[in-house]
Amino acid sequence: MSRYRGPRFKKIRRLGALPGLTRKTPKSGSNLKKKFHSGKKEQYRIRLQEKQKLRFHYGLTERQLLRYVHIAGKAKRSTGQVLLQLLEMRLDNILFRLGMASTIPEARQLVNHRHILVNRRIVDIPSFRCKPRDIITTKDNQRSKCLVQNSIASSDPGKLPKHLTIDTLQYKGLVKKILDRKWVGLKINELLVVEY
């Protein structure tokens, strides 16, 4: 299955706020939920919604998510926490969390168009797995800096997670350590995703 390119707001109304997909948020008393979601929720439906929430937030295909679940299952620690750490340490997500891009699809495009350097090397793979002490910068040209500058200016510096630091003047970010569960930017029960 290919990446989802359809209307984003429909997904947000159905699954709740997904900050990685778009900045828009649904109204609290949405009539759509009353129309379609009546009665008792089945266990399968709950698990499917959690999986879809994770998929659409990080912009993954079904196959990519299954691959991450498989890798997390081989780890000796909790599968759900390892899964979230793998997803949060992706380059496109790190750019989004640093504020260098307003959404994950925008961060993905920055990486694909070769505007981003990791440890002074161009990386054009959005799923590149960052490690602690990785330095993420923009290219030296004016166009790259302008794209990132607009996003940094509109981002909230108070939302920066503890495992990341950013120097807004040099357009440089640093991954200090691996992410803790409490700093994940999405309200999700990762165990339901693993069980699905």
Curated annotation (Swiss-Prot):
Disordered: region residues: 20-39
Domain of life: Eukaryota
GO biological process, one term: translation
InterPro entries, alphabetized: Ribosomal_uS4, Ribosomal_uS4_bac-type, Ribosomal_uS4_CS, Ribosomal_uS4_N, S4_RNA-bd, S4_RNA-bd_sf
Pfam families (alphabetical): Ribosomal_S4, S4
One Gene Ontology molecular-function label: rRNA binding
Record bears the keyword Chloroplast: yes
Main location: plastid
Keywords: Chloroplast, Plastid, Ribonucleoprotein, Ribosomal protein, RNA-binding, rRNA-binding
Compartment list: Plastid, Chloroplast
Entry GO terms, CC: chloroplast; small ribosomal subunit
Keyword Plastid listed: yes
S4 RNA-binding domain boundaries: 89-152
Role description: One of the primary rRNA binding proteins, it binds directly to 16S rRNA where it nucleates assembly of the body of the 30S subunit.
UniProt subunit comment: Part of the 30S ribosomal subunit. Contacts protein S5. The interaction surface between S4 and S5 is involved in control of translational fidelity.
HAMAP family listed in its UniProt record: Ribosomal_uS4_B (MF_01306_B)
Family: Belongs to the universal ribosomal protein uS4 family.
NCBIfam families (UniProt xref): PRK05327.1 (NF003717), rpsD_bact (TIGR01017)
Name assigned to this protein: Small ribosomal subunit protein uS4c
Protein source organism: Dendrocalamus giganteus (Giant bamboo)
